């Protein structure tokens, strides 16, 4: 494994999972750390969403792997004959953890990623040590006629599959569209997300270079199966690990999926046994705006009730090895499973074209 010690940019890695797919990801922090964390991005976002907070956590000794969900970022799309289900993201998380040989781990998720973290923690409590939910908890729910929902999804399936991608003459045009749809996103944050979301192509009509979004267009289609709110609450009842939920002060105004959104979130929080809640200045993407407002809270949450202390960024490799040896002598090595080598990759080309790593 070729190591990139630049905590700010992270290390580009490719993770070959059991289904034969290479998942694109970014890594920060020491591989030998006892603190393992998977970072899950939101809908239509990508691993770059953690570029601001991950380096801070990594400098304190936390190993962080931020993945691109299938159909997002640099990860491949599912075949056209496959339908998309939110449960696929759950299996992706478990497949990645298995490929990394992590016996237990924590999860940090933003928006949809926080929802997936909730389900994984509820369904596999023996694997998840703690979860950090950024601006969301649980998953989207809807009181709908399931048969009609399936009918509508099937009726629109062909149209979405045959839809040609929109081509843009330059990157600025895509950025302008992003800002128009999400005016709260800061310029630097929006640009960071787009760096991993667009690719250069040749226009079939003009033969000139242009740009398109990488994400699977089916992601904007209707969902076939959506939980009812009562089912979401039953799921949240099953979460056994500590939960840190962080909200942005203005996100509720920007993220009004339902009129009674605040009441729904309050109801969900009442079903979580071990919950800590924090409100910080910022929008729905507050984790890309002002990390100093909450990074210390995450660190305290990650290290609380454990015989662990922060690892200074200046800690040498020898000191880390000595600390590792001492922990192993205590017999607390349940989470010291070393990751096998992950292949380095280049963000300028799709991960689907890269050779598979030896995991």
UniProtKB/Swiss-Prot annotation:
Enzyme Commission (EC) number: 3.1.-.-
Disulfide bonds listed in the record: none
Signal recorded as keyword: no
Segments of skewed composition (Polar residues): 334-351
Region feature Disordered, mapped onto this chain: 310-359
Domain of life: Eukaryota
Pfam family, one: Abhydrolase_1
This protein's UniProt keywords: Hydrolase
Active site (UniProt): 111
Class of enzymatic activity (EC top level): hydrolase
MF annotations from Gene Ontology: hydrolase activity
Domain AB hydrolase-1 as annotated: residue spans: 38-289
Family to which the UniProt record says this protein belongs: Belongs to the AB hydrolase superfamily.
Function: Probable serine hydrolase.
Protein name per its UniProtKB record: Serine hydrolase-like protein DDB_G0286239
């Amino acid at each position: 494994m070729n190591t990139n010690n630049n905590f700010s940019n992270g290390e580009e890695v490719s993770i070959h999972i059991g289904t034969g797919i290479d998942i694109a990801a970014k890594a920060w922090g020491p591989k030998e750390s006892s603190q393992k964390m998977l970072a899950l991005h939101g809908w239509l976002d990508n691993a770059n969403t953690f570029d601001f907070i991950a380096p801070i956590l990594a400098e304190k000794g936390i190993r962080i792997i931020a993945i691109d969900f299938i159909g997002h970022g640099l990860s491949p799309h599912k075949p056209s004959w496959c339908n998309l289900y939110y449960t696929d993201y759950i299996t992706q998380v478990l497949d990645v953890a298995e490929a990394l040989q992590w016996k237990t781990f924590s999860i940090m998720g933003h928006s949809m990623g926080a929802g997936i973290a909730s389900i994984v923690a509820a369904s596999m409590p023996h694997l998840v040590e703690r979860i950090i939910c950024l601006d969301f908890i649980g998953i989207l729910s809807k009181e709908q006629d399931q048969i009609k929902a399936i009918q509508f999804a099937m009726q629109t399936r062909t149209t979405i599959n045959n839809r040609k991608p929109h081509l843009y003459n330059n990157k600025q045009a895509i950025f302008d569209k992003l800002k128009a749809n999400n005016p709260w996103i800061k310029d630097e944050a929006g640009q960071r997300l787009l760096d991993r979301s667009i690719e250069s192509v040749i226009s079939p009509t003009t033969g000139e270079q242009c740009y398109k979004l990488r994400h699977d267009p089916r992601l904007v289609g209707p969902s076939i199966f959506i939980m009812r709110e009562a089912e979401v609450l039953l799921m949240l009842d099953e979460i056994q690990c500590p939960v840190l939920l962080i909200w942005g002060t203005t996100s509720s105004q920007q993220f009004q999926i339902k009129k009674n959104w605040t009441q729904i979130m309050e109801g969900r929080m009442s079903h979580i046994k071990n919950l800590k809640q924090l409100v910080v200045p910022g929008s729905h993407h507050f984790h890309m705006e002002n990390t100093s407002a909450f990074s210390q809270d995450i660190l305290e949450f990650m290290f609380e009730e454990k015989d662990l202390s922060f690892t200074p960024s200046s800690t040498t490799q020898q000191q880390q090895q000595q600390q590792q040896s001492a922990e192993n002598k205590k017999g607390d090595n349940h989470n010291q499973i070393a990751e096998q080598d992950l292949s380095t990759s280049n963000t300028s080309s799709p991960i689907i074209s890269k050779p598979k790593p030896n995991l």
